[in-house]
A protein has these predicted regions:
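Alpha-helical recognition segments enriched in aromatics with Gly/Pro capping
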Residues: 1-191
């Protein structure tokens, strides 16, 4: 799904019209605002900036309207830094009449910090600096990737030591587990 689909399909305009028709927006200082405070939020949020540009909030509302119309259960996985944004979006979807309690799950997860040696691998999705998980899997394997990610809860910060994950010795827990599995398998095989 591309954000441009929201514009090209007309869904974004339909959603903005619905928001207006339901009295959920107002104009101020040349911008269009959503009435978040009407639903207990700390402040109202901009949908369309004074220069005419849409905000992420506006397109995210439209995207979630699309998802509510096409899917039974919506699962969003966001970085923990989006905590306030989750509340904002949930409020908007409730205001539009969607069953967020039973159909929308927003999971907030901590970021994984990839480390090589003593240096962190700098990442920023906004600037386009990131290390895709597919590349990590190619480099260290799917077993090691899964293992290291599963050692922490989603709410916990993960320092992912790439060099350790590559090591082929007992310092690397996944290597040790794989080695133990191979030994046990051989013992069982020899019993037959």
């Amino acid at each position: 799904f591309n954000e441009s689909d929201l514009y090209e399909s007309g869904l974004l305009e339909e959603v903005l019209t619905e928001i207006d028709d339901k009295g959920l927006s107002y104009k101020k200082d040349g911008a269009l605002w959503f009435k978040n405070t009407k639903f207990g939020e700390d402040k109202d949020r901009v949908l369309i900036k004074s220069n005419g540009d849409m905000t992420y909030f506006a397109t995210d509302i439209a995207y979630h309207v699309y998802k509510f119309k096409h899917y039974d259960l919506l699962i969003d996985i966001w970085g923990a830094d989006h905590h306030d944004y989750a509340s904002r979006l949930t409020t908007a979807m409730k205001a539009l009449g969607y069953d967020v309690k039973n159909r929308l799950q927003i999971h907030l997860i901590q970021f994984a910090n990839l480390v090589r040696g003593s240096k962190s691998i700098s990442m920023s999705t906004r600037s386009g600096d990131f290390y895709p998980i597919q590349d990590l899997v190619k480099e260290i394997g799917s077993d090691a990737t899964k293992y290291f990610y599963l050692t922490k809860k989603k709410e916990q910060h993960l320092e992912f030591d790439v060099d350790l994950a590559i090591e082929k010795n007992k310092n690397n827990p996944i290597y040790y587990i794989q080695y133990a599995h191979a030994r046990i398998t051989k013992i069982i095989h020899n019993l037959d």
